[in-house]
């Protein structure tokens, strides 16, 4: 027993316990791939949001900023995508010249809200999987452990004289399943909470930007309306 390592325990485990271990290892690999990918995407989203908002508040004209965004409209993300969607709808409704200022601003705000929801949906891709892994992996591992221990005691019942050396390898094989389940679950739960926290922070950032931009469009719409009346 002292010479056994984890690989030996895996190879000597029953077929079902081996299958459970492989499933949990697969969950762990998939979780780490998602953690790395989502972390990179959220880091990029935070940088892009900060860079665009710095540019937005630099005093640049909205029409010029819109033209710049229009030139790369297929690659827009985050705050810039929200801005582009809102200003595009604002310009379209304003040119129609058949809508009250309130309707123009409301239409632009609605377009920005839809765009923001799409951005958040993209940011949240695959994150729920981490929550699922964190929830079910310990139970899958526990099932493997229970099955392995049961299998070990059944085998033990077939011998006349039972000793600790006979049952210990079987129990150790079974407990490996629980260990792998925890190994898969703990990072997944921690990453799930952390990534959701970052998505919520970006959502608040987008929402604040949208409210501020809506206020600017509101002033602009009523200014143009008053000048047309005059």
From Swiss-Prot:
Disruption phenotype: Mutants lacking the tol-pal cluster suffer delayed outer membrane invagination and contain large outer membrane blebs at constriction sites and cell poles. Tol-pal mutants fail to complete division and form cell chains, and fail to process denuded peptidoglycans at the septum. Keywords: Cell cycle, Cell division, Cell inner membrane, Cell membrane, Membrane, Transmembrane, Transmembrane helix. Its main location: membrane. It comes from the Bacteria. It is found in: Cell inner membrane. The chain crosses the membrane at residues 16-36, 139-159, 171-191. Residues 37-138, 192-230 are cytoplasmic. It holds the Pfam family MotA_ExbB. InterPro entries: ExbB/TolQ_transport (IPR050790), MotA_ExbB_proton_chnl (IPR002898), Tol-Pal_TolQ (IPR014163). GO terms for biological process: bacteriocin transport; cell division; cell septum assembly; protein import; regulation of membrane invagination. One of its GO terms (cellular component) is cell envelope. It is a multi-pass membrane protein. Residues 1-15, 160-170 are periplasmic. Belongs to the ExbB/TolQ family. The Tol-Pal system is composed of five core proteins: the inner membrane proteins TolA, TolQ and TolR, the periplasmic protein TolB and the outer membrane protein Pal. They form a network linking the inner and outer membranes and the peptidoglycan layer. TolQ interacts with the N-terminal domain of TolA and with TolR. Part of the Tol-Pal system, which plays a role in outer membrane invagination during cell division and is important for maintaining outer membrane integrity. Required, with TolR, for the proton motive force-dependent activation of TolA and for TolA-Pal interaction. The Tol-Pal system is also required for polar localization of chemoreceptors clusters. The system also appears to be required for the activity of several outer membrane-localized enzymes with cell wall remodeling activity. This is Tol-Pal system protein TolQ. The gene is tolQ.
């Amino acid at each position: 027993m002292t010479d056994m390592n984890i690989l030996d325990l895996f190879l000597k485990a029953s077929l079902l316990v081996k299958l459970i271990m492989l499933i949990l290892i697969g969950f762990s690999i998939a979780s780490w791939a998602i953690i790395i990918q989502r972390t990179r995407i959220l880091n990029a989203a935070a940088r892009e949001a900060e860079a665009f908002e710095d540019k937005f508040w630099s005093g640049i004209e909205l029409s010029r900023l819109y033209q710049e965004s229009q030139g790369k409209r297929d690659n827009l993300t985050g705050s810039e995508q929200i801005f582009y969607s809102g200003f595009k709808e604002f310009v379209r409704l304003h040119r129609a010249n058949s809508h009250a200022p309130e309707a123009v601003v409301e239409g632009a705000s609605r377009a920005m809200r839809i765009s923001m929801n799409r951005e958040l949906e993209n940011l949240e891709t695959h994150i729920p999987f981490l929550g699922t892994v964190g929830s079910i992996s310990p139970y899958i591992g526990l099932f493997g452990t229970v099955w392995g221990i049961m299998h070990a005691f059944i085998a033990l019942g077939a011998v006349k004289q039972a000793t600790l050396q006979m049952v210990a390898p079987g129990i150790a094989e079974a407990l490996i399943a629980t260990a792998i389940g925890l190994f898969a679950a703990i990072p997944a739960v921690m990453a799930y909470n952390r990534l959701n926290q970052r998505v919520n922070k970006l959502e608040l950032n987008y929402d604040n930007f949208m409210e501020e931009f809506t206020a600017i469009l509101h002033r602009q719409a009523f200014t143009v309306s008053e000048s047309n009346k005059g």
